[in-house]
Amino acid sequence: MSTVNEIIEKLKTLTLLEASELVSQIEETFGVDASAPVGGGVMMAAMPAAGGADAAPKEEEKTLFDVVLEEIPADKKVGIYKVVRNIANIAVNQVKEFTGTLPKALKESVSKEEAEAAKQQLEDAGAKVKIV
């Protein structure tokens, strides 16, 4: 099996969260933007609309966010576990299992305000968190 086919097969096994992280790392590593249009459509998209020469096309604003717990420092586990338990509304014995493999989405499809609040609580406890 060729290297390309092996990579494709491995990509098929990724979760959405892992795929999102992969895209982010590819963008950072190679200095590209995965949301940028490719091909002949670039010329058309770059032309201003007839009604307003200065009007730029507005990007659709994201309304739902995921709070991703990326890292828990060993010396701050207890405090972070308490916050994770409260945010995820899970039992004490489930917290360690939940945080066993990171990064992991702690909250999914929540408002920006809720995501920011959860991120702040986790960061205050010492966790490394990002909102996607």
Swiss-Prot record:
The keyword Ribosomal protein applies. The keyword Ribonucleoprotein applies. GO terms for biological process: translation. It is found in: Plastid, Chloroplast. InterPro entries: Ribosomal_bL12, Ribosomal_bL12_C, Ribosomal_bL12_C/ClpS-like, Ribosomal_bL12_oligo, Ribosomal_bL12_oligo_N_sf. One of its GO terms (cellular component) is ribosome. It holds the Pfam family Ribosomal_L12. Gene3D superfamilies: 3.30.1390.10, Single helix bin. Keywords: Chloroplast, Plastid, Ribonucleoprotein, Ribosomal protein. Its main location: plastid. CDD domains: Ribosomal_L7_L12. GO terms for molecular function: mRNA binding; structural constituent of ribosome. Forms part of the ribosomal stalk which helps the ribosome interact with GTP-bound translation factors. Is thus essential for accurate translation. PANTHER family: 39S RIBOSOMAL PROTEIN L12, LARGE RIBOSOMAL SUBUNIT PROTEIN BL12M. Homodimer. Part of the ribosomal stalk of the 50S ribosomal subunit. Forms a multimeric L10(L12)X complex, where L10 forms an elongated spine to which 2 to 4 L12 dimers bind in a sequential fashion. Binds GTP-bound translation factors. Belongs to the bacterial ribosomal protein bL12 family. This is Large ribosomal subunit protein bL12c. It comes from Tetradesmus obliquus (Green alga). The lineage of its organism: Eukaryota, Viridiplantae, Chlorophyta, core chlorophytes, Chlorophyceae.
